[in-house]
Regions:
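Structural motif
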Residues: 1-4, 179, 241
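Glycine-rich beta-alpha loop elements in corrinoid/cobalamin-binding modules
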Residues: 1-67, 273-275, 279
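Flexible glycine/acidic-rich beta-alpha junction loops that bind and position SAM and/or redox cofactors
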Residues: 8-12, 107, 111, 210, ...
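Structured loop/turn residues at beta-strand edges in well-structured enzyme cores
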Residues: 18, 42, 143, 195, ...
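Non-cysteine beta-strand/loop elements that form the S-adenosyl-L-methionine
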Residues: 28, 189-207, 267-276, 296
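Radical SAM enzyme core and accessory elements
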Residues: 52, 281-284, 291-372
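Mobile, glycine-enriched helix-loop/loop "lid" segments at the mouths of ligand-binding/catalytic clefts
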Residues: 52, 56, 62-82, 283-305
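Radical SAM [4Fe-4S] cluster-binding motif and immediate context
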Residues: 74-239, 246, 251, 259
């Protein structure tokens, strides 16, 4: 087993069930490779495993991967083992391919899972040539793919590199999207847009500056507003993500965030409930403040797959936070201007018509499940 949970709690994960023979801590690429090639478990760095006598052993940690070009292209594996048409994300063109150009994130957001558990806070990147070579392979060998998504935690962290990659993508003639922080300069955004950028996935999180300070977001709403306006001017679409229930949340800050979302007005949004994952600063804070009991599993989703509020406060209960989620979505989407924006897209594209109808069905299914 791999991932953030076992990276943070290898002992507890192995002790929880005999069904797991080993877990890969830290970065698991080459750990998995060595296990698959038959290396003795006791010799594999970064591995925790169950010994023949039933005891749990922890090998030395695996050094962090510095040369990201050592990683093989993932796109040929997609082509070999997956039918990409079977995978759908509402804000991306269909079908799409998702790849990473680097690992780690310089930001210190207290809630964010992967940089605090596996990837680290140093952005280690593949060379520009290596990235463009894989995108060219996708273009030439997977003609059905309509968009490439760069899934790095913050693809826009290194401006000159982003601009160089963008110019290379422009020459390849591909459509692409990426994760971005809401502080990318106008000139960089312009170069990205001119070279095939379609959409940015942006974590706004909250409309309250004190909450952004509390979670160490590294920017305030003034910067994000300017960024959003720049995207509008350039015709860059934005899928915005927000979080309810972060430290400092009140009824008033929730209202502030809903209004803020309507002001910056991404094309589409995702609203999450604060999740204190083990290994994150938010988890430690939640335990210290008594918002969460240590070592007690927090229910993050219901049996029906609907997300739940894991932490609450004396002045704002988990139940109240949970119900504000539905309110947020309704007030953002059920506006005449937003409805017309979506309908207008549908009228000019049969592909967009199918996508938005599918999203609409899923949205109303979510509302029914949430109300239940």
């Amino acid at each position: 087993m791999v991932g953030a949970k076992v990276a943070v709690e290898p002992q507890a994960s192995l002790a929880a069930t005999a069904a797991i023979d080993f877990v890969c801590r830290e970065e698991f690429d080459f750990t998995c490779k060595e296990v698959a090639e038959g290396a003795p478990l006791a010799q594999v760095l970064g591995l925790s495993y169950r010994a023949p006598d039933g005891s749990i052993k922890h090998n030395d940690p695996r050094p962090i991967l510095e040369n990201m070009d050592e990683l093989k292209f993932v796109a040929p594996i997609y082509k070999r083992d997956l039918k990409v048409e079977n995978y759908f994300i509402g804000y991306l063109k269909h079908p799409y391919v998702s790849i990473y150009t680097g690992r780690g994130c310089k930001s210190r957001c207290t809630f964010c899972l992967w940089p605090q558990t596996v990837g680290g806070h140093r952005y280690r990147t593949r060379s520009v040539a290596h990235v463009l070579e894989e995108v060219k392979w996708i273009r030439d060998n997977m003609p059905e793919v309509k968009e490439v998504m760069f899934d790095d935690d913050t693809f826009t962290d290194l401006g000159p590199r982003v601009e160089e990659i963008a110019r290379g993508l422009g020459k390849l003639g591909v459509t692409w999207s990426c994760n971005a922080k809401a502080n990318v300069p106008y000139d960089t955004l312009k170069i990205m847009k001119e070279n095939g950028l379609r959409l940015l996935l942006v974590g706004y999180e909250s409309g309250d500056d004190q909450i952004l300070i509390n979670i160490k977001k590294g920017l305030l709403t003034k910067t994000a507003r300017r960024f959003s306006e720049d995207c509008r001017k350039l015709g860059i679409r934005v899928h915005g993500t927000f979080i309810l229930g972060l430290p400092g949340e009140t009824q008033e800050t929730i209202e502030k965030t809903i209004q803020y979302a309507k002001e910056v007005n991404p094309l589409t949004i995702q609203v999450s409930l604060a999740a204190p994952y083990p290994g994150t600063e938010l988890y430690k804070q939640a335990v210290e403040k008594g918002w969460l009991e240590e070592n007690k599993a927090a229910n993050l989703v219901s049996a029906g797959g609907v997300q739940l509020a894991a932490i609450g406060y004396e002045h704002l209960s988990r139940k109240e936070i949970y119900h504000h989620l539905e309110t947020f979505y309704k007030r953002f989407y059920f506006r005449p201007a937003k409805i017309w924006e979506i309908v207008r897209e549908m009228l000019v594209s049969w592909e967009m018509m199918k996508r938005r109808l599918r999203e609409g069905v899923e949205f109303f299914r979510f509302l029914r499940a949430h109300e239940a």
